[in-house]
């Protein structure tokens, strides 16, 4: 699933592209106005006091710039950043090694922080609160605990699932900021900026066409731009207009709403096999041969955001907009069923 062209999850091909396109200062960061203004205030206040920034939790769907914003914070504070992830920190000793090698003021960025084990979380609490590391030496009755002082640092945690964070961990973040899906205007600016960096000739309408199909996600927008650039180079003398962008994205099976074959297959399966719903999550997953978690975490959020599918106590139901988008006519029985489902 992560290899889908419109997947918001990072892919191996994204690494070099994102590094070259990533803004380095808040002034260059497009969109997320509320989060940007909030962080700007806290960063400036910390700089004026000569103190490390308070711990920051960034949450929201993948691909919206949590890693980028973390690097910007480190740049604005003029400190180094150490990057890791929840799954990579398997033991308490792994985290202890990272913490003891931080310099005063450094930023420690932990992606997917909700995937830290409870054992690792336990030594993170005093590190965040008291800038100290509690280490147990020995085992059994003879075991003793020693406390090591740590340099004052800033922890930035990123997660797509804030609800999975343990309350004691979440409560230790002084700054909590949610990143939202981008609007088309901001995405158009992002595409235009990326095209300029990549030296791609693109007009305003071409950038708008790519933005419109990018699912509100900068990572997807940059990836689509790269693919459209290749298509334009071979089929359209290299220049990207609205017509060229639309032609390229249709070729890559990304429709005007940003849906791909997998999205459309999910919607059409509910319509054709279950008369539009309601239908359970496990049944949907089996019908399209996908994992339940993939349907719930990867496919559904965007379809719900676009108003193409809804959740009811009785199961998932497609909306009239989905029928219209897919060009599937609704019979009276289906229309009546959808009206009844909307009451629950």
Curated annotation (Swiss-Prot):
One CC-aspect GO term: cytoplasm
Annotated CDD domains: AAA (cd00009)
Disulfide bonds: none
Keyword annotations: ATP-binding, Cytoplasm, DNA damage, DNA recombination, DNA repair, DNA-binding, Hydrolase, Nucleotide-binding
Region of interest (Small ATPAse domain (RuvB-S)), residue spans: 183-253
Residues annotated as transmembrane: none
Subcellular location: Cytoplasm
Renumbered residue ranges of the record's region Head domain (RuvB-H): 256-344
Enzyme's top EC category: hydrolase
GO biological process, one term: DNA repair
Binding site for DNA: 311, 316
Cytoplasm listed as a keyword: yes
Binding site for Mg(2+): 67
GO molecular function: ATP binding; ATP hydrolysis activity; four-way junction DNA binding; four-way junction helicase activity
Binding site for ATP: 21-22, 63, 66-68, 129-131, 172, 182, 219
Sequence segments annotated as region (Large ATPase domain (RuvB-L)): 1-182
Enzyme nomenclature, EC number: 3.6.4.-
Recorded catalytic activity of this chain's protein: ATP + H2O = ADP + phosphate + H(+)
Major location category of this protein: cytoplasm
Family: Belongs to the RuvB family.
Subunit details: Homohexamer. Forms an RuvA(8)-RuvB(12)-Holliday junction (HJ) complex. HJ DNA is sandwiched between 2 RuvA tetramers; dsDNA enters through RuvA and exits via RuvB. An RuvB hexamer assembles on each DNA strand where it exits the tetramer. Each RuvB hexamer is contacted by two RuvA subunits (via domain III) on 2 adjacent RuvB subunits; this complex drives branch migration. In the full resolvosome a probable DNA-RuvA(4)-RuvB(12)-RuvC(2) complex forms which resolves the HJ.
Protein name as annotated: Holliday junction branch migration complex subunit RuvB
Organism: Desulforamulus reducens (strain ATCC BAA-1160 / DSM 100696 / MI-1) (Desulfotomaculum reducens)
Gene of this entry: ruvB
